[in-house]
A protein has these predicted regions:
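A short linear-motif detector with a strong N-terminal bias
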Residues: 48-51, 118-122, 177-178
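Accessory, solvent-exposed terminal regions and/or long lumenal/extracellular loops of proteins
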Residues: 147-152, 156-206
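Short, hydrophobic/proline-enriched secondary-structure or compact coil segments at domain edges
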Residues: 70-74, 138-146
Length: 206
């Protein structure tokens, strides 16, 4: 059963197009729910009504086309290493190559009030833009035809609440702000939408 499910996830990574999209964010239905609590002073059961977020009935909110692979600049090797430690298969380009990819342009960024591993949490809104780029040797390539594809999308799609952008590991800023190397308005992750042969070498997860 587990092996069959993993094989299905890998096969979907090779199947691009309609019906095989990436769900980035979801919305849940809010409902009233009655809960029985213990009244602290008397110790008697008390029924209260609460707002209940029904995550089991969550509906897709932001959906994007399923990419063939994600690409990440070699300067973010520490982020790539985090992915490989989680079991994600990664490769690196052996030589520079020009590719047509989808890039994320940050339209809005709101900084949170909490820290995660010394990073401020972010909530971002992006738009996807098609462009041709030269990717240098050492660029990380994360194919979606692997068992960890679902986790990979959660980690790399910027709007995902659990993404590296949301957690502050990939610094970004809103488009139109003063450009900064530390916080660019273009997310340093790119979506390769067509199957291509790339000259790559495997990345050692150690």
């Amino acid at each position: 059963m587990v092996l069959e499910t993993r094989a299905g996830v890998t096969r979907r990574g090779l199947t691009l197009g309609s019906g095989n999209d990436v769900v980035v964010t979801t919305r849940s239905r809010m409902a009233k729910q009655k809960l029985t609590m213990i009244e602290p002073t008397s110790g008697t059961p008390t029924e209260i009504e609460v707002d209940w977020e029904d995550t089991l009935a969550a509906q897709p909110d932001l959906v994007r086309r399923h990419p063939y692979a994600y690409l990440m600049r070699p300067s973010f090797a520490d982020v790539a290493r985090r992915l490989t430690y989680s079991g994600i298969e990664a490769k690196q380009l052996r030589k520079p190559v020009t590719l047509e990819v989808e890039s994320y342009q940050v339209l809005d960024r709101r900084a949170g009030a909490t820290f995660v591993e010394s990073h401020i949490r972010n909530t971002v809104t992006t738009e996807v833009e098609l462009k041709k780029m030269i990717f240098p040797a050492g660029t990380f390539v994360f194919p979606m035809a692997q068992t960890g594809a679902n986790f990979l999308a959660v980690a790399l799609e910027p709007e995902s609440p659990s993404s590296f952008v949301s957690a502050g590991f990939l610094p970004v800023d809103k488009k139109g702000t003063h450009p900064s190397i530390g916080a660019p308005s273009e997310v340093p992750i790119y979506r390769l939408m067509e199957p291509l042969f790339l000259d790559v070498a495997p990345v050692d997860a150690r």
